[in-house]
Amino acid sequence: MLLHYAQNSRAVRVAWLLEELNLPYTIKKYKLGDKEMREESYKKLNPLGRVPTLEDNELIISESGAIIQYIISKYGNNQFIPEINSKEFPSYLQWFHYAEGMIMPQMNIIVVETIFLPPDKRNEVNLARANKLLSKMLDVVEKNMENKNYLTGEFSAADMMTGHAVIMSKNLGIDFSNKPFLESYIKRLLSRPALKKAWSL
């Protein structure tokens, strides 16, 4: 498998899973914003010119959640996903999709308003609203983590999705002083060798 990868991007989620499963793969490394990702040769793989994109023989797939579901379904041997009839499975689905449904939309606004836009184009109202909503979304995860080591109890792909989003929120400068369970959760995730490797590629 060939993973098109950039540090501090959602591609880390995919590399994390590949490392947890100890699957062989190679990476094509970019920096976020690289012109190479906007070239037609890459847009044939990913029309949006973004990472991650995974090539598995003739198959090409993008979107981190879709890639993770594909890898687990094809190569996971039932690892990192609860049994479908278990009481944990619905919770797993909820937390797997919480990253992109609830956390990342607010983070995207914050990144645009604080990094991508020039100062004279920034909207402080949008930024304040996104920060408030992101904190609210993280509070829900905080409450869930009160009596758990991982989102559904056992470590799963939901942690690779939403756990990664939580870490990125912290890296973005969101205040975690009133989120002690998330602070512990982040430390627990960052201690995993597979994530250490995925983040350092």
Functional labels for PLM-detected ranges:
Residues 66, 181, 194:
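Residue-level recognition of oxygen-bearing side chains
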Residues 99-191:
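GST-like fold's C-terminal all-alpha helical module
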Residues 91-94, 184, 197:
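Short, solvent-exposed alpha-helical surface patches in well-structured domains
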Residues 27, 154, 178, 198-199:
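A generic structural-conservation signal
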Residues 1-128, 142:
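GST-like domain detector, emphasizing the conserved glutathione-binding G-site
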Residues 72, 165-166, 199:
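Active-site-flanking alpha-helical
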Residues 134, 193-201:
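Charged/polar, low-hydrophobicity segments characteristic of intrinsically disordered regions
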